[in-house]
Amino acid sequence: MATVNKTPVIVVPVIDRPPSETFPNLHEHINDQKFDDVKDNEVMPEKRNVVIVKDDPDHYKDYAFIHWTGGNIRNDDKYTHFFSGFCNTMCTEETKRNIARHLALWDSKFFTELENKKVEYVVIVENDNVIEDITFLRPVLKAMHDKKIDILQMREIITGNKVKTELVMDKNHVIFTYTGGYDVSLSAYIIRVTTALNIVDEIIKSGGLSSGFYFEIARIENEIKINRQIMDNSAKYVEHDPRLVAEHRFENMKPNFWSRIGTAAVKRYPGVMYAFTTPLISFFGLFDINVIGLIVILFIMFMLIFNVKSKLLWFLTGTFVTAFI
C-alpha cells in the first residue's frame, strides 16, 4: 500500500445547486465522503490529503471533493484587481462573478498550499454540469502528466473538423484532444496547479482583464507557453445542462409576464433560451444587456427610424425593456 496526495476535485458554484448533484454517484460509492467547503484564506483539510490506494474500481478514493465558496464579488470588492477599470464598468455582472470565482481560486492560499504539497493537477467543474462516471479521470491525469499538458478543457465551444491527438486509449476509454485557441471555457477543466498560479499572476501584473477575457487568456497562454488541449466529444463525459443557468437567470429577473413566459420556454428550448439570456455588456455598471435586450434596442431604433406610431407595439416593447434591460 502506498500513500499519495489526493487530486482535488473542486465544484465552483454558478447556480444555486448542491455540489453533490454535480457528482450524483459520489455518496453511493463512499457513504462517509462529503464535500469540504473551502473559501478564501483556507486550505484543504488535512484529513483529505492522503489516501491509501487499494482496490477501488470506481476511483472515488483518488480524490478530495471540494466545494469552493470563495471569490464572491457580491460580498466583497477585493477581487476588482482581477479586472481593468474598463471591465469593472462595462463587463457584465455574471461574467465578472463567474470569472472571479475561478481567478480567486487560482490566487488563493488553497492553491499555494497545493503547490507546496507537490499536488500536480486539480479538476475544476462548475455546478451546472454533471459527471456520473469519474473513471476516465485517472487515465486522463496520467496522460496529461506524460504528455506535459497544462490544461485540459472538458467543454467544447466550437465544433467542426480538428486535428485530433490520442490522449487515452484503453479498454474502457478512448479519448482524443485537439489544441485550444480562442475557444476558452471555464465550465469544466483540469489544470496544472503551477499553471493556474502563473496565469493569475500575469493577469494581475497586466492590470487586470479587459472585456476580451477569452482572447486575453489565449494571449497569456501563447506568451508563457501553456499547452491547453480540448477534450474531443467531451459531452460524453461531462454533461452541461444549459437549462439550469437559463432558469437561474429568469429566477433572478424581476417577476413579470415575460419572465414567466421565459421560465416556461426554458423547459422546451433550453439551448435557445440560454443563448437569448446570455449577458453581452454592462451599461456603465447600472444594468446588463443580454441578447434579448440587444434585439429590443435594435427594434426600438427601427421603430424610431420608420416613425412607427402603433401604441400596441410601443406598449409591448416597453414591457420587454422593463423585463430584459
Curated annotation (Swiss-Prot):
The keyword Transmembrane helix applies. Residues 307-325 are intravirion. Does not contain disulfide bonds. InterPro entries: Poxvirus_P35 (IPR004900). Residues 1-285 are virion surface. It is a single-pass membrane protein. Keywords: Host-virus interaction, Late protein, Membrane, Signal-anchor, Transmembrane, Transmembrane helix, Viral attachment to host cell, Viral envelope protein, Virion, Virus entry into host cell. Induction: Expressed in the late phase of the viral replicative cycle. Its main location: virion. One of its GO terms (biological process) is symbiont entry into host cell. The chain crosses the membrane at residues 286-306. GO terms for cellular component: membrane; viral envelope; virion membrane. It is found in: Virion membrane. Envelope protein that binds to heparan sulfate on the cell surface and might provide virion attachment to target cell. Belongs to the orthopoxvirus OPG108 family. Immunodominant protein. This is Envelope protein H3. The gene is OPG108.
